[in-house]
């Protein structure tokens, strides 16, 4: 007996020691873990990741950027039945416990100790899940579980139950990049929370357990099983719903499918520009902070721009041959519609052109085609009229081709993806706001933004910049310059003999007519007369970098490599009275709380603001680096008929706090150039633009060697717009694909919408000009040039040959 008591004493002592050690170990672990726990107060100001939203100037959605989908909601916005579905699924006693389900924890510990399972159910309340989601990782261990318990207790002590549930519903992952209940409801069902049905609520409540492998899109069978056998039945057991309600919900088939927020304004190139600018401004996290970015893009004008570019490129293709089917697939003779449609998987729509596969053709010349959604379309014979070949001879079963909607409802036309590309840039000439931008035919096919990244030769559309330099030097629209052959030779003996596009020469002509008819030799002679160095320096006033402009006479023919956006910016100087504006795209930025954190204040052109009249190239009547083109004309200028000393046109001044754009060129030169470019439309290479029936349309066509590039840049009303058409591989667009043929129709179609209801822009001669008659034409000239008109009037010596060699150095 004594020995037994001794053993019991030793056993008791050991137990006491082990208990003390356990208590000390637990205390040490508690202290070690609790001392490292994060501050729970951060949950009160937590910033959940949200995507970045991009809007047009008129408030229409352009794009959503970000790695996740999330739309945080307040708990009061969550329907009661939806809350009950989550409580029944995750934590039925949520509003009763203090954050810990001790019975569940005991069960989890027992299973971990007695089984080989590393992951066991039970023990995690909604509060614990919030602790894990915000502060811990997903590792299964005693240490993490203890930290989770301690954090849950702290959370319960500082947050209300509804605040905890709100965090849980907004933080939980629902698969397919959807975080939070609102994003899940929109993605899977395209609904707001208050629009959900009971079966949809139950389906959503069942997702967080298996968000990737058990969501209703990835695995609808598994999702339905969890909805019917667990979520709905638990709601019945807890008296949240009746059995009849559950049965009715169970009878509804799974119907979830992807729903993306509808983009209201298709402007992918502009949206991508915003994305890049936001990252540059705020770093990569900008895409996850819930910023709301308002741009300068006008929704109506952007739609018109996209449509115009697509129509213009389609017409370009119609002028050239049918290249054949995009691809041909050998299909079984008995293949049904679904089988045919399956062959279109992975072939995306581009530029409004949809892929279809030919099912059959008819002797009457029509064709039945199948779309990727398994719908059938019947193409009438007229759908391929532009090809000159009946559909039954053009297509065969298994051909994959493109179609796009016609002008009438239900009408479709046969198309082919264009071999050319096009870009359109439209600015508010007075402040540089980008109102429309199309960077190419299809952003889906190629994200290269030709409006801002493509450097192409502008051809004759560059001539107005050279002409403005000549007018600054003392030339005037009536000055005579010969359109005649000339050869330039450098010091190494290399020669350059510029030619007109038509290979002909018209002899002495007024420079107004030379610009209207786009005579290359006159442009070259003008540049040679004023000097390349002067012209390069002067043209930088339009916003170009001097190193972008060739340091030789070829500059006059538009051989610089420039972006369409930079050309539009340069033309804005003509459109706004001579001020250099900066193109801009982001207008406002609001944070997730809709607080304004950025507002753009662009520099504005102001013709009535004298403070802006700075940085003007000074006028002089002396020629620099010129050549003797012959004796001056005997024609004397007539007596001036009018001196314009009247006050300038009254233009409302902007807010005095508005920054003013710097003056780039003399407003008198602007007046002369605008008048000349309006003549380009009235009687020159852009007469098609007369169809707009406006007196303020001005611009210039442009083409390059072998028709590699086609341009039209011009302005009217408040807008300046540049259109470019060309091929990315720099191949020719084809015979006679000039700017007036390939680019101008796009410009006209767009401007018809842009200028609707816009007032006519006036071109009033400013102060310091005199109207006089010279060489049979009445022109406005600068007052200081009146006594030097003959200095800039040349004609060829009759005894000189048609070609004359000059040393350009």
Curated annotation (Swiss-Prot):
Location of region: Transpeptidase: 411-749
Membrane protein topology class: Single-pass type II membrane protein
Region (Disordered): 624-661
Pro residues bias spans: 649-659
Xref: Gene3D superfamilies: Biosynthetic peptidoglycan transglycosylase-like, DD-peptidase/beta-lactamase superfamily
Main location: membrane
EC number of the protein: 2.4.99.28, 3.4.16.4
Keyword flag Calcium: no
Cell location: Cell inner membrane
Cytoplasmic side: 1-5
Active site as annotated: 90, 460
Spans within the Periplasmic topological domain: 27-809
Keywords from the UniProt entry: Antibiotic resistance, Carboxypeptidase, Cell inner membrane, Cell membrane, Cell shape, Cell wall biogenesis/degradation, Glycosyltransferase, Hydrolase, Membrane, Multifunctional enzyme, Peptidoglycan synthesis, Protease, Signal-anchor, Transferase, Transmembrane, Transmembrane helix
Function: Cell wall formation. Synthesis of cross-linked peptidoglycan from the lipid intermediates. The enzyme has a penicillin-insensitive transglycosylase N-terminal domain (formation of linear glycan strands) and a penicillin-sensitive transpeptidase C-terminal domain (cross-linking of the peptide subunits).
Family annotation (NCBIfam families): PBP_1a_fam
Name this polypeptide is given: Penicillin-binding protein 1A
Species assigned in the record: Xylella fastidiosa (strain 9a5c)
